[in-house]
Amino acid sequence: MSFPLIFERSRKGRRGLKLVKAVPKAEDLIPKEHLREVPPRLPEVDELTLVRHYTGLSRRQVGVDTTFYPLGSCTMKYNPKLHEEAARLFADLHPYQDPRTAQGALRLMWELGEYLKALTGMDAITLEPAAGAHGELTGILIIRAYHEDRGEGRTRRVVLVPDSAHGSNPATASMAGYQVREIPSGPEGEVDLEALKRELGPHVAALMLTNPNTLGLFERRILEISRLCKEAGVQLYYDGANLNAIMGWARPGDMGFDVVHLNLHKTFTVPHGGGGPGSGPVGVKAHLAPYLPVPLVERGEEGFYLDFDRPKSIGRVRSFYGNFLALVRAWAYIRTLGLEGLKKAAALAVLNARYLKELLKEKGYRVPYDGPSMHEFVAQPPEGFRALDLAKGLLELGFHPPTVYFPLIVKEALMVEPTETEAKETLEAFAEAMGALLKKPKEWLENAPYSTPVRRLDELRANKHPKLTYFDEG
């Protein structure tokens, strides 16, 4: 049965609320140049229709609150509802308020920054970036400003990335004006040290690494990598996508990283299943601190204030002060668990991943890079099975599928990240489902799912010719 869009439910003249008092005309409140030329085409529905519509939509969704969501490299952990209550309390703040009237909010941001610096081993931090990729770009722009300030901006034009890197890494470097060169992985799934040595030199601006990497493996030679980068004058950039594995146990700053971006919407339980809002703070070592974007939240004798007086700053990277309510949720998470709780969360994330990996191996799946897994691992189905078909089959069995076809160096990759918040019984049920799929007829897998609201989408067409609004005829 098809589910009508809210615009298809619209009937002219229907309304959910009737205003009993005259409302001022928009042109009396808003400058003419900021007014729309034509009124917005909003749906006209009564309140009951509206409630049923969105309640119906909620029942057609899959999320962490409804099922196991092992999306690799996304850390789809449970988001405590207490954090939603905390965020709600700040809803009436306005970014144009005098900072003297928002001391509590500024204190929260300052404290969160201190917590994140302590967890990462960084000396200074900005909370401005609104997402992980936004944080990446901010970090690379800081590195670019640093090299330019030293007179090396014209010579250091290359950024190195591993072949297992997130796609946003090379995209970020390219957006910042750099050439990108790929470093291959060695036979154990870690950075090929000899290949890295051949690429390092006075032409390189930075090396971007994720540790643990996207195969779920810790880069055991990270101190050697860091030493080589330092000798070559290369800045070492930490993609914080996988910090959940080492949170409280190891710090990027102690490994030699100069810049780190974090994903509060992953590691620190800010909801992100619907695409945001996210938060990607960027921490730096002291030599890069002058280039951080403005403003920074600082603590002075008379309280907390916003520091715009930073002459070497790369400038603003976002309006106002970051996605503030995401910061509230992350602050609440850290305050709730404390350091010992964060360490336990990381340990459980690793334990769950290792247990689930062994369960899937027993069911017939292969793990091509089978070292000591951290928070996630990459599996392969037996010959003759496609990762895409297995992912669609999982939807039919009531589970969200893992990430498929990434990292690119693993054929038919199934990237699984169970997170720390899942119970042993859930992992076992998922493994049973994965095993059951291998016993399904090929035709069943190729046509799954069967009972979802939408079956197989034309994903290529959706990417190349998106219809972004109801009124878009494209």
Swiss-Prot record:
InterPro entries (alphabetical): GcvPB, GDC-P_C, GDC_P, PyrdxlP-dep_Trfase, PyrdxlP-dep_Trfase_major, PyrdxlP-dep_Trfase_small
Tell me which Gene Ontology terms the entry assigns under biological process.
glycine decarboxylation via glycine cleavage system
EC number, UniProt record: 1.4.4.2
Q: Which residues carry this modification: N6-(pyridoxal phosphate)lysine?
A: 266
Keywords tagged on the record? Oxidoreductase, Pyridoxal phosphate
Any one GO MF annotation of this record: glycine dehydrogenase (decarboxylating) activity
Query: Which cofactors does this gene product need?
Result: pyridoxal 5'-phosphate
Gene3D superfamilies annotated for this entry? Answer: 6.20.440.10, Aspartate Aminotransferase, domain 1 (3.90.1150.10), Type I PLP-dependent aspartate aminotransferase-like (Major domain) (3.40.640.10)
* Domain of life of the source: Bacteria
Question: Which CDD domains does the annotation name?
Answer: GDC-P (cd00613)
Query: What reaction does this catalyse?
Result: N(6)-[(R)-lipoyl]-L-lysyl-[glycine-cleavage complex H protein] + glycine + H(+) = N(6)-[(R)-S(8)-aminomethyldihydrolipoyl]-L-lysyl-[glycine-cleavage complex H protein] + CO2
Classification via NCBIfam families: PRK04366.1
The subunit field of the Swiss-Prot or TrEMBL record says: The glycine cleavage system is composed of four proteins: P, T, L and H. In this organism, the P 'protein' is a heterodimer of two subunits.
The text of the family note is: Belongs to the GcvP family. C-terminal subunit subfamily.
User: What is the documented function of this protein?
Assistant: The glycine cleavage system catalyzes the degradation of glycine. The P protein binds the alpha-amino group of glycine through its pyridoxal phosphate cofactor; CO(2) is released and the remaining methylamine moiety is then transferred to the lipoamide cofactor of the H protein.
Name-wise, this protein is Probable glycine dehydrogenase (decarboxylating) subunit 2
Its source organism is Thermus thermophilus (strain ATCC 27634 / DSM 579 / HB8)
Q: What is the lineage of its organism?
A: Bacteria, Thermotogati, Deinococcota, Deinococci, Thermales
**What's the encoding gene here?**
gcvPB
